[in-house]
């Protein structure tokens, strides 16, 4: 700031402004705001502006405390958080009426493949060798027919059944569900057979392998029989883990 050819620092200007009486400051502010508000049609009135400036210059802390809003204090809740019931699990659609007999019969067809292939594991279980000759004639023709097909036939079966039946809403939900469950059981059988080839010979032909294949045979056999029973009576087969995976594959209605 240059005044009469001399320089004045900002600190001296502030000190000089602090020494100005309140009345002189108010009058200067009034003249400044009055000149600036002449050209404005709307806004604060001159009396409101002068009252505000006088309160601010006179150190009206009570005015500021009344104008500044005070946020309400937050009280801690005395209630403790509780776990809610998990609703992420699936629910079977309500069965308003029993499915037609042809839908129940068609729902049993996907279980024929895992039912017959489960007998292949019975050959490894020595405990079941005396019973194989009695049941082998019932499964041998079907397995021979499957063996005559090309290798890619099972892959084509899974792709066609999944894309044309499981994923299509035109088919009944009951039928699509059993097709998906039958495919998953067959995949579990195939994975078990592939993994068994990586095991050492001592495990595959030893005493531990004998008990393992006996258990695997009964698990797959009775699971497939239970699914066939549920399909014939018009029910959803409640197989652990398999039902969850099958229900996820079916689009929502």
Swiss-Prot record:
- Give the membrane topology, semicolon-separated if more than one: Multi-pass membrane protein
Q: Which domain of life is it from?
A: Eukaryota
Q: Where in the cell is it found?
A: Plastid, Chloroplast inner membrane
For this UniProt entry, which segments traverse the membrane? 101-120, 142-162, 174-194, 208-228
Induction annotation: Down-regulated by heat.
What keywords is this UniProt entry annotated with? Chloroplast, Membrane, Plastid, Plastid inner membrane, Protein transport, Transit peptide, Transmembrane, Transmembrane helix, Transport
Q: What's in the GO CC field?
A: chloroplast inner membrane
- InterPro entries from the xrefs? Tic20
Per UniProt, the transit peptide runs over 1-82
Q: Does the keyword Transferase apply?
A: no
Q: Coiled coil where?
A: none
Instruction: Tell me the GO BP annotations in alphabetical order.
Output: protein transport
What does the similarity note say? Belongs to the Tic20 family.
Function of the protein: Involved in protein precursor import into chloroplasts. May be part of an intermediate translocation complex acting as a protein-conducting channel at the inner envelope. Seems to be specific for photosynthesis-related pre-proteins.
> What quaternary arrangement does the UniProt entry report?
Part of the Tic complex. Interacts with TIC22 and with the Toc complex.
What is the protein named? Protein TIC 20, chloroplastic
Native source organism of the sequence: Pisum sativum
């Amino acid at each position: 700031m240059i005044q009469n050819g001399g320089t004045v620092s900002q600190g001296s200007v502030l000190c000089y402004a602090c020494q100005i009486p309140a009345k002189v400051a108010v009058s200067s502010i009034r003249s400044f705001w009055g000149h600036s508000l002449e050209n404005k049609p709307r806004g604060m009135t001159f009396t409101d502006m002068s009252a505000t400036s006088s309160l601010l210059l006179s150190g009206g802390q009570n005015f500021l405390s009344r104008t500044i809003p005070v946020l309400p204090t937050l009280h801690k809740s005395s209630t403790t958080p509780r776990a809610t019931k998990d609703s992420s699990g699936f629910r079977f659609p309500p069965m308003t009426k029993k499915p037609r007999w042809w839908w129940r019969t068609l729902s049993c067809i996907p279980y024929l493949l895992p039912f017959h292939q489960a007998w292949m594991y019975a050959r490894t279980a020595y405990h079941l060798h005396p019973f194989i000759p009695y049941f082998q004639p019932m499964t041998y023709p079907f397995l021979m027919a499957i063996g005559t097909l090309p290798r890619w036939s099972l892959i084509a079966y899974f792709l066609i059944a999944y894309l044309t039946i499981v994923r299509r809403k035109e088919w009944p939900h009951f039928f699509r569900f059993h097709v998906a469950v039958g495919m998953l059981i067959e995949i579990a059988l195939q994975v078990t057979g592939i993994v068994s080839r990586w095991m050492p010979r001592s495990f595959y032909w030893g005493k531990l392998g004998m008990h393992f294949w006996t258990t695997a045979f009964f698990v797959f056999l009775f699971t497939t029989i239970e699914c066939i029973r549920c399909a014939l009576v018009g029910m959803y087969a409640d197989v652990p883990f398999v039902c969850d995976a099958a229900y996820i594959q079916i689009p929502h209605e």
